[in-house]
């Protein structure tokens, strides 16, 4: 596999959300947000655990009321993944969840209130060693900025962010990250580009309110892909009107596509045509479903014929090339004598992939111990 990655990460400072490092070259963290009622403690805990199972590094939880803050206390005690409390309007809620061990506070400059309220949040965060995210959003800019610019613009989002960066600077508080999200790809991208030139703090990327699963994934991949390819971004959240688990999957797929961070299998599969010797589409779909639990990074090529199959297999950890009745099997680019019956491909491939993943995981573990 071609291994060169031309991406040079933007230099930034580092903060920690719980034990997860953000910025200064740390792996780009993948986040999601619960969509349960936070006061439904049982449902919220279940969703957080499900997100952690599919690889979420950090989970954000909306805390809109003091009742939700009390629920957050129980939730925080029941999960392992770091939690960010999403705070709007009432700064006192931030002070309350800080008592309960929150790992990060997200505040929205457009509605959190005056500088004195921000000062109270910052002092509380400092006392409890909690980082802050300044979360600017094109849909909730301050009224004076909307009056000035008439609509959300990159300059408006930047000005909103810098106002609050300046406040934190005056308070000598540097444990924060910043986001300037918008639902329009170009608005978000240009806003982040401007911000990246102004500060050294880590940047949290996202296209807000991106849409449903398909359209939202595409929009997020385009917008975040542009920024990540330029080295901008230290943590990401894919905002989808879908199951939050899908946000984590799409997030890792974007990072995987740019070879920034890999988790699980990278499937290389042909779209299929008249030359296919087996049902490529159903084979890939079934393997993706069965192998979701694997976390070891590996490339698996599944090609329906011999036109591109051998070439892709040469640069894959596991490769399958379609043949009449039986298909060729490659291991680390080497064609094996063993061939797979086309009627039983999924079971055969699953066994080989799991065995390979186990072997590779052991090698990684040994290498880590040696280092």
Swiss-Prot record:
GO biological process, one term: isopentenyl diphosphate biosynthetic process, methylerythritol 4-phosphate pathway
Enzyme class per UniProt: oxidoreductase
E.C. no: 1.17.7.3
Cofactor note: Binds 1 [4Fe-4S] cluster.
Cofactors: [4Fe-4S] cluster
Keywords: 4Fe-4S, Iron, Iron-sulfur, Isoprene biosynthesis, Metal-binding, Oxidoreductase
Entry binding sites for [4Fe-4S] cluster: 270, 273, 305, 312
Function: Converts 2C-methyl-D-erythritol 2,4-cyclodiphosphate (ME-2,4cPP) into 1-hydroxy-2-methyl-2-(E)-butenyl 4-diphosphate.
HAMAP family named among the record's database cross-references: IspG
The protein's name: 4-hydroxy-3-methylbut-2-en-1-yl diphosphate synthase (flavodoxin)
Gene that produces this protein: ispG
